[in-house]
Amino acid sequence: MKLAFWICTIVALTFSAAAAEKFVVDSVAGTEAPENNGDRGPARLINIGDPFGVEIGPDSALYITEVRHHRVRRLDLATGDLSTVAGCGRKGYSGDGGRAIDAELNEPYEVRFDPDGNMYVVEMQNHIIRRIDRKTNTITTVTGNGRRGFSGDGGRATEAMLNQPHSIALDENGGIYVADIGNHRIRRIDVRTGVIESIAGSAERKLPRDGQAARGNPILGPRALCVDGNNLWIALREGHSIWRMDLRAGILHHVAGTGEAGFAGDGGPARTAKFNGPKGIALGPGESLFVADTENHVIRRIDIRSGIVSTIAGTRPDGADEGERGDEVRLNRPHGVCVGPDGT
């Protein structure tokens, strides 16, 4: 079986593997230069300035958030063509009610899609989440008032204050989960009612405890989220660990990482391994959880059934190469990771 993923460092990389083979790395977009050199063209010739978030869209294209140039890019994986779908390239906060491509964004960190194909973008420095309508390409703010802070629980999400939100995840029941990292909380927006609430975290900055109720208890630096049915998977940047929240019971379960920064534990239990500032997380086939272990410059895989962790890409020194086995390739602070639904 062929398996492919996309990860973001300064360039987008793709991994492929057959059952009996090592993972292989290949660049699919970007150059080694971050400067803006155009909105459209062959992906391997277009510069991508600080690509952080990646996601496969409902059209099977790869969507990339370009933090440095405040845009969302679309990579047609069939043709290799790269284009801009949101953001005019200027830093700011404007454009609601108009075309997404004309809007000013401010450090878009992640992109996700709802079941109807509408795009959601979290803007870290605008402290908001915006929605781009699939049919009209109209952009609107759905969470955050543009001011940094903490307020709004129990009220309208558009009137709430967030603090440098980094990651979002969407469930199938109209819920948007937000890694409100500056507030050390995870918040949920009900799309149907427009109401926001905190479902995990507090003002106290320390690691959670295994089996602890999520609401009202600390959760240290939630940086990346992904959702799978009743489970919300969480990477803690300051907490150097991975957690699972049972959304029905509201309980946190420890998955990986001791909470101490470092690099150790491959081949053993993930809970006793060391991570260093993980900033990306994604579920894959075979009950695999993939983690961008950013400050270790590697991608790691957690087997959810066995609880064993392994490194599948990166050798720890920073810098990026391609066309080699995953365990021989150097990465440079990988941030985003995603796995296509069809394994490509």
What spans do the regions from the language model cover?
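Bacterial N-terminal signal peptides
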Residues: A4-T14
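Boundary at the C-terminal end of the N-terminal hydrophobic targeting segment
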Residues: A17-E21
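Gly/Pro-rich loop segments of beta-rich domains
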Residues: K22-D50, T79-E107, T136-Q164, T193-G221, ...
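Residue-level detector of Asp-centered blade-edge/turn motifs that repeat once per structural unit
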Residues: I56-D59, F113-D116, L170-N173, V227-N230, ...
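Conserved beta-propeller blade signature
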Residues: A61-Y63, N118-Y120, G175-Y177, N231-I234, ...
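Short loop/turn segments immediately following the C-termini of beta-strands
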Residues: V67, M124, I181, R237, ...
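A short loop-to-beta-strand structural motif that recurs across blades of beta-propeller domains
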Residues: H70-R74, D81, H127-R131, T138, ...
